[in-house]
Amino acid sequence: MSLATMKRCFCGFRHMGVLWMLAAMPVAAGTARIYITNHAGTTIQVVDPATNKVVQEIKDIEVPESVHFSPDGSRVYITNGAENVLTVLDRKTGKQIKKVPLSGHANDLAVTNDGRRVLVCIAETPGALDIIDATSLEKIKSIPTKSRLHDIVVTPDGKYAVATSPAGKFASVFDLQSEQPSWEVNFDQGALVPAIESGPDGSARRLFLQLSELNGFAVVDFAKRQEVTRIKFPDDEPSVVPSGTPSHGIGIAPDGRTLWVVSRSYDSVFVYSLPEVRLLGRVHLPELRLPGHDPIGGSPNWITFTPDNKTVYVANGADRSVSAIDAKTLKAVARIPTGEEPGRMTTLVLP
């Protein structure tokens, strides 16, 4: 998915139902932390990119799907797939503020740039985009969609949200002022993880997203409101048996100069220059080798970055690990053990 690095405050905490397993330590301004959800477990782990070690762990969140923060860092928002709620935590005290009931199974979430609303994808038929007021912590609106939603990103200028639907095979663009669907792009395959490239004025220029049967990614021109091309990964090496869709996980580096796209079929992440979309290289990721079986992929998926653009993190779902990659040398520098099926990751930075 696209970079979720934002300037936030960070603190370890303990509260009813959620526990920081390792003691919280003072964190200096400008320090980054990588938050990792474990989709088949009950934990969210926190990694210090300076050491690539897990420094804290949140427990007792059943099927954590996604984690984001309020702009001022005062709240933590977590979608809870098992309970169909948005769990809201106080960042300073660690106490649970509220569990906000949702319309159905909670998937990805996003926070509007002004912090006033939390947007949650409902991955349950018939599908919806739930809007939660961040002041009252009440669901104030549920926008019906043609099918269940998977992932969501807010455009850099804060004017739109883009949500994708694997089952419905579309990407829907929502106007955040009117809180209504604005336009959509339909595909011949399921629409998966999106990333948004901004233009010089901060507005959305291109949408990069993965499709359910494409070992590569599609490119949508935001102004034209249409798909303009598809890019396939080079097929110069034997593939492994992918666990899931061929390609799942995409992100744009903080400086906007590179696009990183995961291939499950090749158990790799490919790097492209922006705005040219020219292939720069690839990084091989861990494979699973079971006795008596052909190698299978480690199911690489989600991506995040350190704010200095130096390190890229890729979650390896089947391998129960996250790979830390040096963005300059394109070499893996660490394999970080995680919980069951690591998934969405978010980078947080102290102001």
Predicted regions and their residues:
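Bacterial N-terminal signal peptides that target proteins for export
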Residues: 2-20
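Intrinsically disordered, low-complexity Ser/Thr- and Pro-rich stretches
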Residues: 1-2, 8, 253, 306
